[in-house]
């Protein structure tokens, strides 16, 4: 059984017992979170597609940890002008473990 959920403006295909990194959620480590924006639920050949969401479907997850991704370096460079600007960015994430899919 799997589902497609929306979190942080992105769509994720999830299965029960799977861990994934989402955009940062304001939930403490060890807490639980429910995703009610479920776009698709599939159980074998039984597939429910929402328009836009599946009514009554929800995915529950447990927050495992918070952290930051690897650094992304941004460089702006003007050729022949002796001008270069460097900037780095590390995006926050929340790692969750999917505990249940209903729907």
UniProtKB/Swiss-Prot annotation:
Record key words, sorted: Ribonucleoprotein, Ribosomal protein, RNA-binding, rRNA-binding
GO cellular component: cytoplasm; ribonucleoprotein complex; ribosome
PROSITE patterns (alphabetical): RIBOSOMAL_L21
Subunit structure: Part of the 50S ribosomal subunit. Contacts protein L20.
Family: Belongs to the bacterial ribosomal protein bL21 family.
HAMAP family assigned to the protein according to its UniProt record, in alphabetical order: Ribosomal_bL21
Protein name as catalogued: Large ribosomal subunit protein bL21
Gene name of this polypeptide: rplU
């Amino acid at each position: 059984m799997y589902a497609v959920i929306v979190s942080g403006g992105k769509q994720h295909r999830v299965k029960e017992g799977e861990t994934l990194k989402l955009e940062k959620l304001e939930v403490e480590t060890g807490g639980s979170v429910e995703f009610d924006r479920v776009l698709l639920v599939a159980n074998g050949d039984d597939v429910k597609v929402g328009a836009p969401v599946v009514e009554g479907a929800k995915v529950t997850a447990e927050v495992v940890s918070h952290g930051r991704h690897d650094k992304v370096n941004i460089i702006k460079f003007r050729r022949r002008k002796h001008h270069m600007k460097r900037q780095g960015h590390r995006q926050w994430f929340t790692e969750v473990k999917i505990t249940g899919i209903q729907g």
